[in-house]
Amino acid sequence: GIIISPVVGGIIGLLAHLFVALRTGFPLSLPVHILVALEMFVVVYITSIIFNRGKVILAGIVGTLLNGIGFTFITGVFMYFVLGGMNPVDFLKLLGLPLTLASLVNIVIAFIVSKGLKNANIQV
């Protein structure tokens, strides 16, 4: 999304999540992973738009918090009401920190790669 268009980046995020979930057997169920894949599209799309407007730090913060906290809670709500899973707050307590840290690491890596490609004058 930050190297290519936000829409294409979002589609890549969506498909990447589905492929990883498929390889692990959709451990939280197919409906949950479809929701998470759609959330990946949204977070990559929004983060890319903010990044491409030159607000790199804001993009990192928004992407990290949206993916790590916001969408984790939304997924917890979905699991609770649709699938009868654990309380959404407990789901967030369980997964919020590790997913937020993973999101931060992924976003920092994407920003570094983007800067490296830009400095090397490589266009994708």
Enumerate the predicted regions with their spans:
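Loop-helix junctions at membrane interfaces
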Residues: G1-V124
